[in-house]
Regions:
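Residue-level detector of flexible, active-site-proximal loop/helix-junction positions
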Residues: 34-36, 278, 306
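P-loop NTPase motor core of the ASCE superfamily
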Residues: 67, 79-85, 183, 258-262, ...
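P-loop NTPase motor domains
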Residues: 1-269, 284, 288, 336
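H-loop/switch region of ABC-family ATPase nucleotide-binding domains
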Residues: 275
Length: 339
């Protein structure tokens, strides 16, 4: 219990765990639909992006990876998704570099994407004149405006589809400011709960993806940050932060999670993904599903009810010869034994 925690859980279990975790440190409940009975905390992913950072392009790209879900096996969507990421990244960087601080949010980026055609074109032409972010903003606008009208319309439609969840006033409010930093999970016993009711999971799973991805990015970057002479080793927790991903399948395929399974142990992070069966993992990660199994320190299995998972579990356990003895008795005869 004395470790930092990030949990994507259903409301009932969160309420029980959250009350217990308050004994150890700060508890932040991000609950846009207010099903936990407590006011929701907020986290704005754009708050950690700074206009003069050399990593601004990379940071914007990590956000677009979380926003744009690549369905497993749908190769035909790859081009449109990559182009959607490109224009989204440019709009995110423009927002960070040219908007007032109180306007720097994904809700503003969504506003850009849904502008009337003539106003959107004016915005893109303004981006072409920007020299911020090392010219990346201008390149993004040039890339989009250089497309034929039909292709550009398809790319824009795809970007709008992947950001549709940002139209929710509840989600926009929850992403408007930051009440904490995910890097806190490495420095003090902090608990973060991401709460979505089951009936909202399909529509708003990208919100979960976004926050889990940003948490992993922030922790990795904090771990790589050199400590100053005044900052002793005691400033960082000795026990790893636990990511309890109860709704793992709802996240979709997320490269940040895949990387974390192999690398995050060195960053003071422990992932605990929870799945209904092995098919969910294979559907999401294909041949890379083995990465999760190979890097797992412990595997827990309960109530196996499907053949594929039972077969996998049997193969993992291997074979062993078991010896046993049976006793039998018949009236009028002595006992008999067999091995």
């Amino acid at each position: 219990a004395r470790e930092a925690l990030l949990a994507a859980q259903c409301p009932g279990r969160r309420r029980i765990a959250g009350e217990a975790r308050q004994r150890f440190g700060a508890v932040h409940v991000l609950d846009p639909f207010e099903v936990s009975g407590h006011p929701s905390a907020c986290y704005n992913p754009l708050d950690r992006l700074t206009p003069d950072s050399l990593d601004l392009g990379e940071d914007a790209a990590s956000l677009t990876e979380a926003l744009v879900m690549d369905p497993p096996g749908q190769v035909t969507e790859a081009h449109w998704n990559e182009e959607a990421k490109a224009i989204l990244g440019g709009l995110i960087m423009f927002c960070v570099c040219h908007e007032d601080r109180d306007r720097r949010s994904l809700a503003t980026v969504r506003e850009y994407l849904t502008l009337p055609p003539e106003k959107l074109r004016a915005l893109l032409e303004l981006m072409q004149d920007s020299d911020a972010a090392g010219g990346l903003i201008a390149r993004s606008a040039n890339r989009f405006l250089g497309k034929a009208d039909r292709e550009a319309a398809s790319v824009l439609s795809n970007a709008q589809r992947h950001t549709h969840f940002l139209d929710s006033p509840r989600i926009a409010r929850c992403l408007a400011r930051s009440d904490f930093a995910f890097a806190d999970l490495r420095h003090r016993i902090t608990s973060v709960f991401l709460v979505l009711p089951p009936n909202r999971m399909d529509a708003y799973s990208r919100w979960l993806r976004l926050l889990v991805s940003q948490a992993l990015q922030d922790i990795a970057r904090d771990a790589e940050r050199p400590q100053s002479a005044s900052e002793g080793r005691s400033e960082r927790l000795k026990t790893p932060a636990l990511f309890l991903l109860d709704e793992f399948a709802a996240l979709g395929r997320l490269e940040a999670v895949e990387r974390a399974m192999g690398l995050m142990a060195g960053y003071g992070l422990q992932l605990w993904p929870i799945l209904q069966d092995m098919s969910q993992l294979k559907d999401l990660y294909g041949e890379r599903a083995g990465t999760f199994i190979a890097n797992a320190g412990v595997q827990q299995v309960f109530g196996v009810n499907d053949f594929e998972t039972a077969k996998w579990l049997s193969q993992m356990m291997g074979q062993e010869t078991a010896g046993f003895q049976t006793d039998s008795f018949k009236p009028g005869d002595g006992p008999s034994f067999s091995n």
